[in-house]
Amino acid sequence: MLNSFKLSLQYILPKLWLTRLAGWGASKRAGWLTKLVIDLFVKYYKVDMKEAQKPDTASYRTFNEFFVRPLRDEVRPIDTDPNVLVMPADGVISQLGKIEEDKILQAKGHNYSLEALLAGNYLMADLFRNGTFVTTYLSPRDYHRVHMPCNGILREMIYVPGDLFSVNHLTAQNVPNLFARNERVICLFDTEFGPMAQILVGATIVGSIETVWAGTITPPREGIIKRWTWPAGENDGSVALLKGQEMGRFKLGSTVINLFAPGKVNLVEQLESLSVTKIGQPLAVSTETFVTPDSEPAPLPAEEIEAEHDASPLVDDKKDQV
């Protein structure tokens, strides 16, 4: 009965306006009130502030600053084995396994379309048919920055407008095609392990989705699909990210879906639905053996990457002033 009521609310509540209101409130500097809200949040969700670069809740000017707080480097060591891909986010694995032609497992007994997830881009979908997927859910208590599982060269980004259903076990079991319906940002990379997609999925109260190369992707929510492309390799304007490097973040939010090409990686055997994930821990292993490369891709420069988009670059956390 209670679950039925919760599901009904998903269709009745004005999710877009709730999300806009949450985003507005989370970005406001309210002094003691901001600190009170953060303290209550930390207590309720049992957030481990000892991992944060700034453990004192009074050091955050807005709730958003707290929510995307950077962690101390040593608390998330990155597996350095060149054959290992690492977890991109702190959270819990919702589902993982093989992509069956066009079908991805959403929950037990419920599948959704790979092509629909990729906004009908059948050429991109062809890269991942019969490949491997991992869906990672980020709870409110988790660190909400998303990192690279491996070295990658950004080739394409697609913003897909959509619904803002909550993402949790209940909705995954009961809202058909949940991840293919919600707002999302699709990022396609060239990697040593073949093409890889890393998809940031929005949800109710997700104030924004951002990337390190383009800043805020949403809002604004204009209701149209947007697409950006970047050159390959070391060409001018290319964007290279290193294994373990931050690639994006949620301001309140949600879910990361990784897609890997067929025959390229094997997921770590111990992983299963509801496995806890920590950035930098092993996620998958290459089906081929790599030696440590003599050189790595040049990391993303500190200055804004020049690309044709309307987004703003992210602020360097280490340069933030309290």
Curated annotation (Swiss-Prot):
- List the residue(s) that the UniProt entry marks as the site Cleavage (non-hydrolytic): G253, S254
Major location (coarse) = membrane
Q: Which reaction equation describes what this protein catalyses?
A: a 1,2-diacyl-sn-glycero-3-phospho-L-serine + H(+) = a 1,2-diacyl-sn-glycero-3-phosphoethanolamine + CO2
Any one of the GO BP annotations: phosphatidylethanolamine biosynthetic process
Cite the record's Basic and acidic residues compositional bias ranges.
308-322
Q: Which HAMAP family match?
A: PS_decarb_PSD_B_type1 (MF_00662)
Reported function = Catalyzes the formation of phosphatidylethanolamine (PtdEtn) from phosphatidylserine (PtdSer).
Question: What's the subunit arrangement here?
Answer: Heterodimer of a large membrane-associated beta subunit and a small pyruvoyl-containing alpha subunit.
- The name on file for this protein is Phosphatidylserine decarboxylase proenzyme
Q: Which organism is it from?
A: Escherichia fergusonii (strain ATCC 35469 / DSM 13698 / CCUG 18766 / IAM 14443 / JCM 21226 / LMG 7866 / NBRC 102419 / NCTC 12128 / CDC 0568-73)
> Gene encoding this chain?
psd
